């Protein structure tokens, strides 16, 4: 099978890379700690339809930060409209070598707004004006027209938020890494491949790239399984997602985990505590956990995790013998037996689990 491994600190590839290569595996690396040691990853290379544009924008919004407008959803929705319009134009109209985040950032940087002149047209306005003249129903034109409903001061605030969200792309190394693609994510189900996603466990500045990679990976492989291979990939793809809470949010994961297994894709989410998953996915966390066939507990002290695991393990029946002795004029003795239910592993017992032991819970097995 193929492996996709989250590799905090980059130690896994050093320990296993050579062995995998000797056993016929292709090795792919996305290194967000040291971009000079990374292969190129261009999310735009995996856009095949308008739906993919919307998925990419959703992932970008959920895993990056704007300028923090107090939680007002208006600003995020306005940003989303602009990203959708610009990415739609880049994908549908720009030359192949310009289909990347670098072009997106340059277009936003060139969008000058003048508050005192509502009729001023910047270079991007002129691009969309020409495109509208050729094709009024163009997807990108329709999205851009909605963005242009905002007034000058509002538009400037939206652009500032966009600039803050995409500020990381001003780093030359990141611009180079995302300029074109070498990962070939859509081929991981075709032949044995090991993809190592190296990320920092102390700095999450570039973790949105890892989340974006997983999001596109799941969608690409599911589509390829259905469209090319009749529902099942020829090579099983196993995702070992360590430090899952630090990666960010994969949109619609609660639906993906319920459907990927039938397409020869499996996912192993590794967390420090169950509460981390709930912080990311809120009510959908229970759905994600419910779709997992196995649960491996290596120890921990987080109360919610311990309580839910204790309840999931259930109870065992124990026999209790009670003896009594009464001393009066005459001495009498009594002995009674009863059966009681006891937690198979109490919260206290789980909290002090031996470091050399673990608890594995399998679906359908007690």
PLM features per residue range, with description:
Residues 1-265, 280, 339-340, 348-366:
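P-loop NTPase motor domains
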Residues 257-362:
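Conserved ATP-driven motor cores of ASCE-family P-loop NTPases powering translocation/secretion/packaging/pilus
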